[in-house]
From Swiss-Prot:
This is Large ribosomal subunit protein uL15. Belongs to the universal ribosomal protein uL15 family. It comes from Acidobacterium capsulatum (strain ATCC 51196 / DSM 11244 / BCRC 80197 / JCM 7670 / NBRC 15755 / NCIMB 13165 / 161). Keywords: Ribonucleoprotein, Ribosomal protein, RNA-binding, rRNA-binding. Pfam families: Ribosomal_L27A (PF00828). Part of the 50S ribosomal subunit. The lineage of its organism: Bacteria, Pseudomonadati, Acidobacteriota, Terriglobia, Terriglobales. The gene is rplO.
């Protein structure tokens, strides 16, 4: 078997359906649209979500909840990520410089997934309980930034 004589399996590559090209093709005359009716006319396309007059799914389901416009969103970082950085002190500016924190939404929360081996001082807006315990266990400091 060579690259020059490879063949696709039967029915793998099907021909495109060419409509309106004579009765012999099987798709002539009405071009698979049937006779009369809205769907047979040109430019007919039902709107997205239309289910033939039945109440559509997006209207059958109830509305739930609301969007809180005062929600504060934090960028979260785990201790495992901090351990990879090999730094002794991590300030907010250091996180921004390394591309881990966005300048526009500069709120940072440290989570406790992972382990630390060296003592580090971390400045952040929030710490989870487990993160704070793990940082202080190895002799580091978790400093809250206002």
């Amino acid at each position: 078997m060579n690259l020059s004589n490879l063949r696709a399996p039967k029915k793998a590559n099907r021909n495109r359906k060419r409509v309106g090209r004579g009765m012999g093709s099987g798709h002539g005359k009405t071009s698979t649209r049937g006779h009369k009716g809205q769907r047979s006319r040109s430019g007919s396309r039902s709107m997205r979500g239309f289910e033939g007059g039945q109440m559509p799914l997006h209207r059958r389901l109830p509305k739930r909840g609301f969007t809180n416009i005062f929600r504060t969103e934090y960028t979260v970082l785990n201790l495992s990520r901090l351990a990879e950085l090999n730094e002794t002190e991590l300030t907010i500016d250091a996180f921004i410089a390394k591309g881990l924190l966005d300048k526009r939404n500069g709120l940072l929360k440290i989570l406790g997934n992972g382990e630390l081996t060296t003592a580090i001082t971390v400045h952040a807006h929030k710490f989870s309980k487990s993160a704070q315990e793990k940082i202080e266990k190895v002799g580091g400091k978790a400093i809250l930034v206002a």
